[in-house]
């Protein structure tokens, strides 16, 4: 852990805040499947409400306010929250927002029209709340708001690797990031890695940035083989005898090198484990799918696309190792959740993941196929990995209430100006 950095615990706050804490949270990420930023938004909002950290929480969905009651309908013991992608959770406002965003995704110009309309709508609807509420944007884009503002910048991938993103996404995220950097917005980052990028490369004052590490899904835990057997049998898998890859199928996830390293290891008979790939198809992923299809055709891999939370947690707890040597991450939640489930992790050196990874983590050079291959070879042959990771680490024990509490500290600091 980077102990030389300050956390939200270092922010000086009044002992007894006199003002109520009222927050408008950007709810747009809740309109799709709850992966990445959608998951962050849901878990943060749910923890803020459930623990009564905020006095009032409103969800703004670009064109109108969303039904915050959907946060209370999720059952943390079930397969997981569906968000507003599930029609039964949407309500009229959510359905309108989903339809509008579908239109915006059609082209760059449709996206620009959508941003103009939603920006005007936000300015009009949010104006009355400027004196009573703080606005927190969880996804790079900050609407016009005259009150206190907080923005979470999860990563700088659209700036670091613009070639990996659609043009409209690059324009939107770059605009949001630069607006936050140039304005008087307090910034939250998921890692010190991104915080350092903002300070060193973009000249953002460190006093304006707070790092709040994420937490694993509250259902993450090691599971006995008997508990996983039904799901594993359905997939034809053996307990602790397969590699797992989790994340969107896109160039930034470095899957081409993973597939190359995996095939080389199988060809050399270093291991006989299959590779299980979980993740929705992303942009510019045709080559990744071609290589994956070749592995599947040869009986070496299985592609599961998007799976339920319950299935994913079972896979984490059952895998011999998570293979996650991403080229760039703002945090790397799959690595944390896998470790919290007792799964060994192979991930990138000098990355955000190094801030929370357990001692047994195997770090690799993500740009070196042989480095990845050596790590794949090491896992099945090392007995200490047979029973999984020791998950008794600070990061694995962290909860979303911890995240919400530290985030509320940032809110109060932002309100103090």
Give the ranges of each region predicted by the language model:
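Carbohydrate transferase catalytic cores enriched for Leloir-type hexosyltransferases
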Residues: 1-417
């Amino acid at each position: 852990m980077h102990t030389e950095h300050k956390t939200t615990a270092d922010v000086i706050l009044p002992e007894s805040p006199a003002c109520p804490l009222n927050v408008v949270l950007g709810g747009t990420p809740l309109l799709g499947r709850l992966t990445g930023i959608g998951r962050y938004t849901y878990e943060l909002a749910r923890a803020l409400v459930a623990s009564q950290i905020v006095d009032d929480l409103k969800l703004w969905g670009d064109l109108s306010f969303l039904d915050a009651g959907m946060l209370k309908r999720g059952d943390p013991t079930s397969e997981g929250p569906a968000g507003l992608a599930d029609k039964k959770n949407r309500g009229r406002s959510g359905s309108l927002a989903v339809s509008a965003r579908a239109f915006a995704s059609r082209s760059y110009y449709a996206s620009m029209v959508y941003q103009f309309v939603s920006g005007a709508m936000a300015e009009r609807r949010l104006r009355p709340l400027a004196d009573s509420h703080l606005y927190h944007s969880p996804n790079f884009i900050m609407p016009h708001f005259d009150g206190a503002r907080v923005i979470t910048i999860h990563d700088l991938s659209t700036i670091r690797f613009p070639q990996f993103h659609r043009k409209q996404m690059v324009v939107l995220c770059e605009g949001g990031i630069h607006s936050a950097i140039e304005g008087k917005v307090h910034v939250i980052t998921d890692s010190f890695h991104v915080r350092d990028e903002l300070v060193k490369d973009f000249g953002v004052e460190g006093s304006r940035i707070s790092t709040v590490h994420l937490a694993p899904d509250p259902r993450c835990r090691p599971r006995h083989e008997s508990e996983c057997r039904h799901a594993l049998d359905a997939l034809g898998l053996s307990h602790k005898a397969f590699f797992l890859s989790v994340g969107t199928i896109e160039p930034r996830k470095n899957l081409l090198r993973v597939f190359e390293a995996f095939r080389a290891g199988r060809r050399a008979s270093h291991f006989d484990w299959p590779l299980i790939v979980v993740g929705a198809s992303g942009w510019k992923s045709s080559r990744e799918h071609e290589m994956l299809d070749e592995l599947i055709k040869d009986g070496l891999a299985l592609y599961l696309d998007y799976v339920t939370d319950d299935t994913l947690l079972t896979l984490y707890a059952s895998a011999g190792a998570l293979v996650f040597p991403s080229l760039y991450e703002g945090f790397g939640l799959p690595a944390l959740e896998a470790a919290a489930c007792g799964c060994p992790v192979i991930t990138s050196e000098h990355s955000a993941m190094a801030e929370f990874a357990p001692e047994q983590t195997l770090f690799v050079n993500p740009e070196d196929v042989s480095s990845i291959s050596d790590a794949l070879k090491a896992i099945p042959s090392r007995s200490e990995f047979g029973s999984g990771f020791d998950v008794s680490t600070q990061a694995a024990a962290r909860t979303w209430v911890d995240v919400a509490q530290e985030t509320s500290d940032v809110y109060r600091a932002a309100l103090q100006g």
